């Protein structure tokens, strides 16, 4: 007997696109753009819940814990994508934000049959990463019923983790399984059931908020500058200089000299220049300030 998906918003037909196969290219992209515009409005109704997830993630980081994103298919790929962007953007170890996709790395580029239907696989994946009560597990599923995600959330709760769920159906199974439900109703997809569209867009926006918000709360930004950016290519080398210039008002040569004196740390260079101290003292200030530049600048001379 097949699953009953008829009650899910993500599986219903969109009345605006019943004649999609008869539309011109311009009509297709116009209706898609109009439907996509509904996504931020739907997310706006979930902001308090998203903010709670940001708080929990930041608290986990402060305790030495990690943030796990779990999903299958598009949902899992989005979690892996957002997790992979954290080390170069925020200078954190790759183990700090982890994206788990049902079926493993292979599933990122091709479907792995049956993987999303296995609760046990989720438990194995979390155990392999040594899940602890200090971690936060966020389950992602547009349908809100993916067994892999449900298994991960149940195991995480047994360990004592905070758990959150991101779904695109109201009253979802994963929303009920998690401590915190982030359920966004984007309406039916332009192409019926193709949740890589509006649902995927909504998930990506929410994941951006959780990852960025929690990193900002733990000192990874000064003003709106990403002060822990890693200089892994020429563009980022220049961006690092620009960040120091924007934060301090110094000339490029002085910005580069400060970065070099700080061992490549943009955050330390900014603290040196604004607190008028050397790299060693700037590092001590930042340690005392738990990595927050604004607080480090205000500290008394050590």
For the regions a protein language model found, what residue spans apply to each?
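Phosphate-interacting basic helix/loop segments used at nucleotide- and nucleic-acid interfaces
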Residues: 43, 50-55
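Aromatic/hydrophobic pocket-lining residues that form π-stacking "cages" and hydrophobic walls in ligand
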Residues: 56, 152, 210
């Amino acid at each position: 007997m097949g699953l009953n998906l008829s009650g899910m918003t993500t599986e219903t037909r969109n009345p605006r696109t019943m004649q999609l196969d008869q539309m011109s290219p311009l009509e297709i992209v116009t209706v898609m753009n109009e439907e996509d515009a509904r996504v931020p409005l739907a997310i706006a109704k979930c902001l308090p819940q998203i903010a709670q997830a940001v708080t929990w993630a930041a608290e986990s980081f402060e305790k030495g814990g990690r943030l796990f994103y779990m999903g299958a298919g598009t949902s899992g790929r989005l979690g892996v994508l957002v997790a992979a962007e954290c080390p170069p953007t925020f200078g954190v170890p790759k183990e700090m934000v982890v994206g788990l996709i049902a079926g493993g790395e292979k599933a990122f580029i091709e479907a792995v049959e049956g993987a999303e239907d296995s609760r046990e696989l989720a438990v194995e994946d979390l155990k392999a990463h040594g899940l602890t009560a200090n971690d936060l597990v966020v389950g992602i599923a547009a349908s809100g019923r993916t067994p892999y995600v449900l298994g991960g959330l149940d195991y995480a709760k047994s360990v004592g983790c905070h758990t959150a769920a991101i779904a695109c159906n109201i009253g979802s199974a994963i929303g009920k399984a998690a401590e915190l439900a982030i359920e966004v109703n984007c309406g039916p997809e332009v192409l019926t059931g193709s949740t890589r569209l509006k649902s995927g867009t909504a998930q990506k926006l929410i994941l951006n908020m959780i990852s960025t918000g929690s990193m900002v709360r733990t000192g990874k930004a000064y003003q709106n500058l990403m002060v822990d950016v890693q200089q892994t290519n020429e563009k980022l080398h220049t961006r690092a200089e620009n960040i120091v210039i924007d934060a301090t008002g110094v000339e490029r040569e002085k910005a580069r000299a400060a970065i070099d004196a700080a061992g490549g740390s943009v955050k330390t260079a900014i603290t040196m220049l604004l607190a008028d101290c050397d790299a060693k003292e700037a590092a001590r200030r930042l340690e005392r300030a738990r990595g927050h530049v604004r607080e480090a600048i205000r500290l008394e001379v050590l």
